[in-house]
């Protein structure tokens, strides 16, 4: 059975394509499950052979797509450590942080037949876990909003500045209150391990959400 290495195929690009497609679905599902937007703006779709809820709101969808478009070059170069969906209350204080911790093996040689099928199974399991995360999380206060943060390796700063010049969607340094949350508990949701990608998903939830 033939094997593929990084020299034969741009695995960074493959991983970035797979991961950004997954993150788009995951972000939509988080917003639906956690009641950040009215359920009426979501439609049921099929992804990874499971039903998911996807937004039909053009501006919201564009924001998510633009964000992931800027994240993608960082994933390709293995410079993104975490992608975080931050849920904030009316005072813009975080009440939940969905953290996708990403790592890629530096070297690999895998069979082409198993490149995608195994990863899709793992991503399906992660989507299913997100869809039922309400069971382990407390309700959020009304009027919550969200933002997406990216934690990068130090060497990625210059690359982010280049992307900022190209895209009309500038990177800004996150506010300290968005990055750190006091009195939070950590709730592990799912871990996946494959030949091309390792990812851990957990939630940091504020103990007292009511202000």
Swiss-Prot record:
This is Mitotic spindle assembly checkpoint protein MAD2B. SUPFAM superfamilies: The spindle assembly checkpoint protein mad2. The gene is mad2l2. It is found in: Nucleus; Cytoplasm, Cytoskeleton, Spindle; Cytoplasm. Adapter protein able to interact with different proteins and involved in different biological processes. Mediates the interaction between the error-prone DNA polymerase zeta catalytic subunit rev3l and the inserter polymerase rev1, thereby mediating the second polymerase switching in translesion DNA synthesis. Translesion DNA synthesis releases the replication blockade of replicative polymerases, stalled in presence of DNA lesions. May also play a role in signal transduction in response to DNA damage. Residues 13-203 form the HORMA domain. Homooligomer. Interacts with rev1. Interacts with rev3l. Interacts with fzr1 (in complex with the anaphase promoting complex APC). May interact with cdc20. PANTHER family: MITOTIC SPINDLE ASSEMBLY CHECKPOINT PROTEIN MAD2, MITOTIC SPINDLE ASSEMBLY CHECKPOINT PROTEIN MAD2B. The keyword Magnesium does not apply. Coiled coil: none annotated. GO terms for biological process: cell division; DNA damage response, signal transduction resulting in transcription; negative regulation of protein catabolic process; negative regulation of ubiquitin protein ligase activity; positive regulation of DNA-templated transcription; positive regulation of peptidyl-serine phosphorylation. It comes from Danio rerio (Zebrafish). Its main location: nucleus. GO terms for cellular component: cytoplasm; nucleus; spindle; zeta DNA polymerase complex. Keywords: Cell cycle, Cell division, Cytoplasm, Cytoskeleton, DNA damage, Mitosis, Nucleus, Transcription, Transcription regulation.
């Amino acid at each position: 059975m033939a094997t593929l290495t990084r020299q034969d195929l741009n695995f960074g690009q493959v991983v970035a394509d797979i991961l950004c497609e997954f993150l788009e679905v995951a972000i939509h599902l988080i917003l639906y499950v956690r009641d950040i937007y009215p359920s009426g703006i979501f439609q049921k779709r099929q992804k990874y052979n499971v039903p998911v809820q996807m937004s039909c709101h053009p501006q919201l969808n564009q924001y998510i797509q633009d964000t992931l478009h800027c994240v993608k070059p960082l994933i390709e170069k293995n410079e993104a450590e975490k992608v975080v969906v931050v849920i904030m209350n009316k005072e813009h204080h975080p009440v939940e942080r969905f953290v996708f911790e990403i790592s890629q093996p530096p070297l690999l040689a895998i069979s082409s037949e198993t490149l995608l099928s195994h990863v899709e199974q793992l991503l399906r399991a992660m989507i299913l876990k997100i869809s039922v995360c309400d069971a382990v999380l407390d309700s959020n206060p009304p009027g919550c909003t969200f933002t997406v943060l990216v934690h990068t390796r130090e060497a990625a700063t210059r690359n982010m500045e280049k992307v900022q010049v190209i895209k009309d969607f500038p990177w800004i340094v996150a506010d300290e209150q968005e990055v750190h949350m006091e009195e939070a508990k950590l709730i592990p949701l799912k871990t996946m391990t494959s030949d091309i990608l390792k990812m851990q998903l957990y939630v940091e939830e504020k103990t007292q959400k009511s202000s």
